[in-house]
């Protein structure tokens, strides 16, 4: 009889372990569901790609832009690769990940081509526009993407051209930072990076 009770207890314990590992069964009161906890803690989705090119990922970049991209030393950005869209109206600056692999970049900046001094070596792409993973693109209306930015820090500046609104976010436990600059409710610049401070 004692052996049957022990066997039943072992089987019940195994069943509870299987349910815990597969996520089946009820969550007891007072215990934390990790997936739900992460969803609650992340204030906004993170923007980490432009046209499928992912921060710090060499494979996605090689598939979209090619294996060897020219690296230049460009103004305030350091070593980077500068790309333009097909008609040359937008510039994508890919900043080199120091200590990383070839074609590994840890900062992306997108600006209109008229807003910066153009470097001599620009890689022209076949992309019509540079669009981020969350739908941001140069010239988009603030209303198109403000839902993703509701929990970000917001700062307004008065300039000669009008009011500039900057949404930004930094994560305390991960080296990630993003900024979206709007002038007259239109996106004029955006950038994100995953660099250690």
Model-assigned labels for residue ranges:
Residues 1-28:
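Bacterial Sec-dependent N-terminal signal peptides
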Residues 22-161, 171-174, 182-197:
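Short helix/turn-capping signatures at newly exposed starts of structured segments
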Residues 179:
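Conserved catalytic or metal-liganding residues and their short signature motifs at active sites
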